[in-house]
Design a protein with these regions (language model features):
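Structural preference for solvent-exposed beta-strand-turn elements
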Residues: 1-141
Length: 141
């Protein structure tokens, strides 16, 4: 959680770890967000997604620079929903910057989420924990 607490705090969010160790549980209080230009020490789709989603509601432009481009599923989804977002690559295999503008009016779309065993595992585990339950997971490889 520490990896997302830091940039969100830089944006003006009020987030603290209940036990002071940077781990959940967290205390999150409302705050006015402002855009930042964040350079991530590692390529992480999770950290990048968190910052870009917060950037939708921030005042001013928000960008995330990674040493190499991580998975871009959030950027593709936000662009499809109408967000003003772009990714700039320097060279193949080198740093990439994703930039989003605030105050977007997003438009819902019909989407299909690809099968992913790591996501399905939670539902499978839940089905195993509940006696006499049934679960059907399709198209997961």
């Amino acid at each position: 959680m520490k990896r997302i607490i830091e940039p969100l705090t830089q944006m003006g969010a009020h987030i603290s770890s209940l036990h002071g160790n940077g781990c959940a549980p967290l205390v999150i209080e409302p705050g006015k967000l402002h855009g930042i230009h964040y350079t991530s020490p590692v390529a992480s789709a999770q950290v990048k997604s968190c910052i870009l989603l917060a950037g939708l509601y921030a005042e001013g432009e928000t960008s995330v620079t990674e040493p190499i481009l991580s998975r871009n599923h959030t950027e593709l989804m936000l662009k499809e929903f109408g967000a003003d977002i772009r990714t700039v690559h320097q060279l193949a295999g080198s740093e990439a910057t994703s930039v989003i503008q605030p105050c977007q009016e997003l438009h819902g779309q019909k989407i299909t989420v690809p099968g992913d065993i790591s996501s399905a595992a939670y539902f499978i585990a839940a089905g195993l924990l509940v006696p006499d339950s049934e679960i059907l997971v399709k198209n997961v490889g």
